[in-house]
Amino acid sequence: MLPENNTLSIRSYEVKKFLCPMGLKYQKIHACPNNCVLYRDEFASLKACPTCGFSRFKKKIDGNSGDEDKDGPPAKVMWYLPIIPRFKWLFSIKEDPKNLKWHVDGRKCDNLLRHPANSSQWKKIDETFLEFGAEPINLRLGLATYGMNPYGNLSNKHTSWSILLMIYNLSPLLCMKRKYMMLSMMISSPRQPENEIDVYLKPLIDDLKLLWEEGINVYDSYSQESFCLRATLFCTINDFPAYENLSGYSVNGHFACPICEKNMSYIQLKHD
């Protein structure tokens, strides 16, 4: 994200002072504790969930006004780090636009699967969407998500779900480096989002749809010209339970395998 030999301060306040003027801000979005809706767009002004009726805010008692309830902090919050300003910033660093064309200019084509660019899925996208595939700078993104306990113990009283984006245009040496792995969203609460994770993904999906359907105007510091940047979600990376949450495909029962589906063979364990 920063030019070579530049580092950020270890103090959070100093980092915010440096990043926010670049447009690299985050959005703090209120959410229903029951994972029904995000309080944005048409729900931005509501004080209770339109689906379950649960209050948007925690209630607190003001000691100066008897027992009158006052709106406290939000009952649940998620953090969204908009991806479009970060992609624009990526193209402002001279070497990065060149690196993003590696899959065309630097990849070895010998029918061996060394990189996602060698896969049949990558080739299928190029053949199906000719205009998109003709521009090597267009982004192919991977989305990864996983729940974790931020306190490092076995307690299930709090979980955090992070949503990461990887850029597969880059070479294997670069695409898994921390610099190019973008934290786009953090969902933190006592309850896991489970199958309602799609509610929280809405801001990210809106940006991805814009990048796919219309594109955004970006200045390429390497070629020193502006162009229309587009992107596609190439794949998702997750464990099997999270696969069900993201795709809606049931991973339980006889047809749990998403590859075999009804053609899967199975053996009942003797003592199961």
Put a short name on every predicted segment.
Residues 9-272:
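Domain-level cores of phosphate- or acyl-group-handling catalytic modules
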Residues 1-10:
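Amphipathic alpha-helical blocks
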